[in-house]
Amino acid sequence: MLEVKKISVKVSPILFFSLLALEIISCNTPAQKAEIPPNIVFISIDDLNDWVGFLGHEQAITPHMDQLASKGYSFTNAHCPAPVCGPSRTAVLSGLSPVTSGIYDNNIKFSRDLPKVVTLPEHFRNNGYQVYGIGKLFHGGASNVPKAAFDLYGGKSGSAAPFTSSELQNSKQDPYHLVTKGGKTFKLPLNGMPADRYWNKSHTFDWGPVDLPDSLFSDRQSVDWAIDQLDDIKKEPFLLALGFERPHQPLFNPKRFHDLYPLDKASLPDVPENDLIDLPHRAKQLALYPRTSGRHQTVVKYGQWENAVSSYLASVSFVDELIGDLIKALEQHRLIDNTWIVLWSDHGWHLGEKSHWGKATGWYRSTRVPFLIVPPMGQKQFKKSEQVKNMVNLLDLAPTMADIAGIPKSPKWEGRSLMPILKQEAENWEEATLTTFSIGSHTISTPHWQLISYFDGSDELYDMVNDPNQFFNLAQQPQKTQMINQLKKYIPEESRWNYFIRYKDYKILVPKKGDIQVFDQILEGRNDEDIAAEVPGLVKKILGYIEENKPQQKKFTIDVL
């Protein structure tokens, strides 16, 4: 039998209280540190495609973003919920997909369209965070920022800087006009191209160096404001949200950034001569019409392709330098050890791929986005320089950030928390993600395939492993029918609608309740411009066609009425 003996030890009063103090410190200090919620710096970048160093672009000079990628997680298969500013940002900041929110275009005002939705920054405020915001976060400028979103909002949303929107008006730039800034005179448009996006009031499809102080550019002003808040923050935890305007057009930047990319060194995207030949009718329209930017043929005609590529990369490098300034300030304020950094772009941007400029398409150049999550430097349990290949979506931001902060997630949010991936605990991850580029039109992206399904029932299918530039549409191959049908299972039902119909150049939506809506399909994404009242004869014929034929398919084209 084991014998247990009592041992008595005499301890001096000084030693006793010293040991007691050590016990109190050892018990309480780590717990107190663990109880301090982390800060989050939330960085959005407008119109940034995957032309960054950490995603493999050979010319992009982005040392600060690359350094962030080396300290955290870079998601190499991240896609946007919508390839246009308004619906993508609405999805991120509401946690709701375009199909759920009904926001498919840039005609968005939260107070009018989503008055009951608690936005992501407001959710953090409601859960004990001090929330600061500056720059382009919500679409539509400072007037569209919900009052409850931030404790303090600094404004500064305006992509025209250093010029004003008035100075970029089409009527003033036909063919050009002179603007004086900082004692210097500029001839606009800088690229010498005429505006061919006629419906837009401002001629922003322009680029080139602007030799003015950084302080005249809104992104520089936004970063300076954000850094100033770090000086004044009295309470943690905080969420600091910073929205950059560049590389949104016009691609105007301080001259030194353009000097980084000589025109004779510009590497242009590969655009085969007959690249559009295997596309459906709707896709060709989407490629060629200058909805969000100008025409490819205009860029080529005026010899501006190299200049545009150089200016886009200059914009990216300008933003990168500003990000570096913010990170340096976090380090100087000794906040870096308890601050997560989340960096994302609202969607991609074409620079001639598919003969298209701008965004708003279903191709990967519009849907793929840079996305970084960088844990605090003091948290060693997370890996560094981890390239994550799982399919993820910007809708995943809201639940992920809630998990990072240790606050409740809204049951209405539709994304998936990425915390299991960050902790290497993700099992059975669904490797497919959805991008919606208009009512009834969607892209499904997987590691191997990208399916683009249009409202009229036409499709594109690309093998992203063997054809990453999407040169060969495989949708018409009979052996791919099963794959297409399998991918279409990820497309939402959109139960509000009975039919999506294309007739000539009209897009027709037939709801289960209410009146038929008719749109000019060339401007398909502008779903606020219903012209049904202007074409009553067409509406009558469509109703007659449906009554007579009782279509079984939800999406189809009518050739003759």
Where are these regions (language model features)?
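Terminal low-complexity segments of carbohydrate-biosynthetic enzymes
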Residues: 316, 520-521
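Long, charge-rich, low-complexity alpha-helical segments
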Residues: 548-556
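Short beta-strand micro-motifs enriched in acidic
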Residues: 452-454, 509-513
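Short hydrophobic beta-strand that contains or immediately precedes a catalytic carboxylate
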Residues: 461-462, 518-519
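Formylglycine-dependent sulfatase
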Residues: 2, 10, 27-454, 458-459, ...
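Bacterial N-terminal signal peptides
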Residues: 12-23
